[in-house]
Amino acid sequence: NPNSIDSKYALKPFDMTWVDGGRYAILGPSGCGKSTMLNIMSGIVKPSEGRLLFDGVDVTDETTSDRNIAQVFQFPVIYGTMTVYDNLAFPLVCRGYDKAFIRSKVNEVAEALSLENLLPMSAKKLTADQKQLISLGRGLVRDNVAAILMDEPLTVIDPDLKFRLRRKLKEINQKYQSTLIYVTHDQNEAMTFAENIIVMDEGEIVQVGSPAELFDRPKTTFVGYFIGAPAM
């Protein structure tokens, strides 16, 4: 609440360009502003100052539904009374697409996510990682999605499955050329997933760079220790 006398801004001023089709991680400790940045992009939170542009168009005042953004939250959001197929089809059904198109897109995305054998199953019977894949799949079925925003999406996933899911996310990025923005406080997740990492601390972007750049040339002591760079 920046209008309060004693309050601090959740995010300090910054100017950031996200390249279409890129794979990003927003990395930093809890409470540093990562989720706030993500929620401003999706439209859940409106910034008190500044503007947000999509391909040069100002969308700061646009609703979430008008931004063509998909968001995957920390805990899977699924419809337990529906089948896996119906969960994946739901965004298209709501937008009035015909059944043949819906079937084609759902089957395509289910195959990409290795969910094709689960389509007839009740979604409530799935494991946590399978439910999170459904959340991701609902973003992928829409052709007009500009970016998929993920807020610590692997928190509820067993450690032995995390690497497999990060690899699957990379495959999705390459197949669909979707912009993926991934919030995490886990250095290993960021370093093994992203092409570019945005390191944050106390509402400020401290450094932006590839995993190799951050590891070899950290700009600050904070970045060095947080990344685990040998130079520090």
Give the positions of each predicted feature.
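The feature captures the beta-strand-to-loop junction immediately N-terminal to the Walker
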Residues: L27-P29
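Helix-to-loop junction immediately C-terminal to a conserved catalytic motif
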Residues: S42
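Conserved ABC ATPase "signature" region
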Residues: D58, V93, A100-L118, K170-E171
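ABC ATPase NBD coupling module
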Residues: D58-A70, F75, C94, K99-R103, ...
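Short coil-to-helix segment of the ABC ATPase nucleotide-binding domain corresponding to the Q-loop/switch region
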Residues: M82-P91, S122
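Conserved ABC ATPase signature
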Residues: S122-L126, Q130-Q132
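Conserved ABC ATPase "signature" C-loop
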Residues: T127, E202-G203
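ABC ATPase "signature
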Residues: V208-G209, R217
